[in-house]
Design a protein with these regions (language model features):
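Conserved micro-motifs of the catalytic ATP-binding
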Residues: 22-27, 66-71
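Short conserved segments within the C-terminal catalytic ATPase subdomain
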Residues: 48-60
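Short helix N-cap motif at coil->helix boundaries in the Bergerat
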Residues: 118-126
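Short beta-strand/loop element within the Bergerat-fold HATPase_c
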Residues: 96-106
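Acidic ATP/Mg2+-coordinating residue in the GHKL
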Residues: 114
Length: 186
């Protein structure tokens, strides 16, 4: 039997997807530190017992600087968790995952990249056009693919941001997220 905590988390995650699919805005917008939220998301993955085939590196583009925005902390951590776990899921032989955060042109920036197998060019085009992502069931009949990235795009849109997908050099995937910064509320 599935532990109750797991069931609650799964049901809660479904609610997030449903809320966003029906264009309802997240209700918990608050002043938050983007650097700290990103660091927490990376720490949560590392503390969940990450397999030794994977390495996650966290970097601040402007070290020691906090970046504030109005956002839903839980949704933004979920977005980063989905991106990191997407790299893990699609690179079963392991990879190095880099999460870099900072400010660029008045926006909070986050770049999640890996040196894994990358993504097919046609799928990359579909993602960047913002077309509806169809989920596919993996050969193991358990893992659905596509829902994590769909949720990422919905969370970014709900925060009035942009997301782009590109090949990482020399191979792998790079996801670039830009969210509007907000002044610190006093």
């Amino acid at each position: 039997p599935m532990p109750m905590k797991c069931c609650i988390k799964t049901a809660s995650g479904f609610g997030v997807t449903t809320k966003l699919e029906y264009a309802l805005q997240p209700v918990h917008f608050q002043d938050m530190d983007w650097v700290e939220t990103s660091r927490q998301a990376v720490s949560e993955v590392l503390n969940s017992g990450l397999d030794s085939r994977y390495e996650i590196v966290f970097a601040e583009m402007q070290p020691g600087r906090s970046l504030h925005l109005l956002g839903d902390d839980g949704l933004l951590r979920r977005m980063l968790d989905n991106l990191i776990r997407n790299s893990i899921t699609h690179n079963p032989h392991g990879c190095r995952i880099s999460v870099s955060v900072g400010e660029e042109k008045g926006h909070c920036l986050c770049i999640v990249s890996d040196d894994g197998i990358g993504i097919e060019p046609e799928r990359l085009k579909v993602l960047n056009r913002g077309d509806d992502i169809t989920s596919t069931q993996g050969s193991d009949e358990k893992n659905e693919h596509g829902l994590g990235l769909k949720l990422v795009m919905q969370i970014v849109k709900a925060h009035r941001g942009t997301v782009s997908f590109s090949d990482s050099t020399p191979h792998g995937l790079e996801v670039r997220i830009s969210l509007p910064t907000q002044p610190l509320i006093s």
